[in-house]
């Protein structure tokens, strides 16, 4: 792009122009300053509305946190964790989330920079020859930047708001991950306990089968079957223990814990709620409240403002003015002003305008796509939630009680010498397997419940999040007995004792 430099020497009105040019950047420089909170207060409010707890931004590098935050972390870790405590811990100590918060500082700096004029340019020239010395001085200011300052500041402010919504979305995501990891860790621990019961039962059956074969009361094939089941139960328990370790480590990562690994989990998952949620206007609520939908709208609005700025500066992209002073040996000093602008001889700004229009069109369609996906995700998530609740209730009200009654009937038949001890042990194993399936169904329900809340409040359900206004939160409360505890060894011993009394 060619540039045309126009200079005039003016003997009058120069002081006025100089004063105006010098005063403008000084005045405008005070219009944009850094906020005391760095833009974080809005992030805290958005997160609190959806999670129930506000995050904390550790703005001091290093491992140090405030004494108040450290005290709260120690307090939460000093008692068995709950879903809500896991969420609060994650918002206090997750370092990945702190890294996302640091992006706010970048956006805040860009906003302040956009609200200030570019620094003036000063030039000094010194020529000497033939006994003559010529000195040129000039000070140049960006007039175009001054004229477009309000629009540029508004665009940067919207970009900061985008960064705030992105940070809040990240905070809700971390809270959701912590909540889901909590339910997974508790369920995995329960499954280990019931897996140990299966191994105990299989161990008793295998040892009894070996003794009965030695006594000639059991054939070799039946004895090997019992032994094979015992071996498979041991292998299954090993896998369950690893899954428990993996689930606990996932929770540790979500909480952002480093050396503090001795946190305690509750014994059981929370009970299944008596009634399922019935959402009203869930799709409309999601479109209005979801952070990703709001973020897409903000991006489209900021792109529209950028498009307006591009159109306004389409033909003149460089416009500078300033004071010029020239002195020469033996001649009076000359004062004037200089204007520098860029002439659109080869590019009339069509490429920049076309690019800005394409970006706006992209943002417009992305916003519509996000809203469409939000509605679909709400319907899908509620279907998963309702299926999980129905399935868990079916296990709670039908399968587990039926297994218990079958076990009681089998014990009566064993005491009446109508079934063998192997049938009694096999039935106890089946009961444990049924209880384990109920634990899995209950875990899946709580995860589905949490993901539904995430879909309604923030964005795609990658994890769980508590507390939204769209649907009442099902209070998990303290962990209570999720399923009956079946002690296979004790059951076998009581059966043998009952058999002895019968004789």
Enumerate the predicted regions with their spans.
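Short segments within alpha-helical structural elements
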Residues: 232-259, 366, 402-458
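Short, charged, amphipathic alpha-helical segments
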Residues: 101, 157, 220-229, 421-429
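Regulatory alphaC helix of protein kinase catalytic domains
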Residues: 59-89
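Alpha-helical heptad-repeat coiled-coil segments that mediate oligomerization/polymerization in large
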Residues: 219, 374, 381, 417-420
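Periplasmic alpha-helical coiled-coil/stalk elements that build and connect Gram-negative outer-membrane
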Residues: 3, 32, 149, 165-285, ...
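A small-residue-enriched
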Residues: 31-56, 88-145, 244, 248-260, ...
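Bacterial N-terminal signal peptides that target proteins for export
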Residues: 2-18
């Amino acid at each position: 792009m060619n540039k045309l430099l126009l200079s005039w020497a003016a003997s009058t009105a120069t002081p006025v122009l100089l004063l105006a040019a010098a005063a403008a950047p000084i005045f405008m420089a005070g219009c944009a300053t850094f906020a005391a909170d760095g833009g974080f207060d809005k992030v805290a409010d958005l997160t609190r509305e959806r999670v129930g707890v506000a995050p904390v931004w550790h703005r001091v590098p290093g491992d140090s946190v405030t004494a108040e935050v450290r005290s709260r972390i120690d307090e939460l870790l000093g008692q068995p964790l709950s879903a809500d405590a896991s969420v609060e811990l994650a918002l206090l100590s997750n370092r990945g989330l702190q890294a996302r918060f640091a992006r706010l500082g970048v956006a805040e700096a860009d906003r302040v920079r956009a609200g200030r004029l570019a620094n003036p340019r000063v030039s000094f020239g010194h020529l000497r020859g033939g006994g003559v010395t010529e000195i040129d001085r000039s000070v140049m200011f960006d007039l175009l930047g001054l004229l477009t300052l309000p629009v540029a500041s508004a665009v940067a402010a919207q970009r900061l708001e985008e960064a705030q919504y992105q940070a809040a979305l990240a905070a809700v995501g971390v809270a959701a991950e912590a909540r889901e990891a909590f339910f997974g860790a508790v369920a995995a621990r329960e499954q280990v306990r019931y897996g140990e019961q299966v191994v105990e039962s299989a161990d008793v059956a295998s040892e009894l089968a070996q003794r009965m074969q030695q006594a000639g009361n059991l054939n070799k094939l039946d004895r090997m079957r019992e032994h094979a089941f015992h071996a498979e139960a041991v292998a299954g328990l090993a896998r369950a223990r690893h899954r428990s370790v993996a689930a606990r480590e996932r929770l540790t990562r979500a909480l952002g814990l480093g050396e503090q690994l001795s946190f305690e989990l509750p014994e059981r998952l929370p009970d299944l709620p008596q009634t399922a949620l019935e959402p009203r206007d869930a799709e409309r609520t999601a479109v209005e409240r979801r952070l990703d939908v709001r973020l897409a709208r903000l991006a489209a609005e900021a792109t529209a403002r950028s498009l307006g700025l591009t159109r306004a500066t389409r033909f003149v992209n460089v416009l500078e003015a300033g004071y010029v002073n020239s002195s020469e040996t033996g001649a009076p000093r000359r004062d004037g002003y200089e204007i520098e602008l860029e002439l659109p001889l080869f590019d009339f700004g069509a490429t920049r305008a076309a690019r800005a229009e394409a970006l706006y069109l992209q943002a417009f369609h992305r916003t519509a796509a996000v809203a469409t996906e939000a509605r679909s995700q709400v319907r899908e998530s509620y279907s998963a939630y309702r299926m999980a609740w129905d399935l868990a209730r079916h296990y709670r009200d039908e399968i587990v009680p039926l297994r218990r009654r079958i076990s009681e009937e089998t014990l009566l038949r064993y005491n009446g010498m109508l079934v063998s001890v192997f049938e009694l042990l096999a039935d106890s194993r089946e009961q444990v397997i049924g209880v384990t399936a109920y634990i899995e169904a209950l875990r899946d329900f709580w995860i589905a419940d949490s993901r539904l809340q995430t879909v309604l409040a923030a964005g795609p359900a990658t994890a769980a999040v508590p507390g939204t206004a769209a649907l009442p939160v099902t209070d998990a409360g303290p962990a209570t007995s999720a399923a009956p505890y079946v002690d296979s060894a004790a059951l076998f011993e009581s059966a043998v004792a009952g058999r002895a009394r019968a004789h």
